[in-house]
Design a protein with these regions (language model features):
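N-terminal, polar/charged subdomain of small-to-medium soluble alpha/beta proteins
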Residues: 1-99
Length: 99
């Protein structure tokens, strides 16, 4: 699976982007038809808590999956977004298997 990890309006460390990439690499275990993923990291300054946001778009043949998640850290937001993406890509795999 190809993936793009893009920090928006800040510079992310290589360790952070590598770790987030490793989290989302696991998605192909749940749906082998995933073409690619775009992951955007945003730092929200308007709220004192839950100020890190991740937006994930998973590209599947015929349908894309989009998830947004906010948390206190990017790693926490990434893990929560991964959990939601996992459920959605499994559902899409089951739908495509029945058609």
């Amino acid at each position: 699976m190809d993936k793009t990890i893009e920090p928006v309006n800040f510079n992310a460390s290589k360790e952070l982007t590598d770790h987030i990439g490793e989290i989302f690499d696991k998605l192909v275990k749940y749906n082998d038809r995933i073409v690619s993923a775009d992951i955007y990291l945003k730092s929200l300054r308007e709220t004192p808590t839950r100020d890190k946001k991740i937006e994930v778009r998973i590209f599947l043949p015929g349908k894309d999956v989009f998830v947004e998640q906010e948390a206190d850290s990017f790693i926490s937001a990434a893990q929560q977004a991964f959990d939601r993406c996992k459920i959605l890509v499994i559902k899409e795999k089951e739908k495509s298997a029945t058609h």
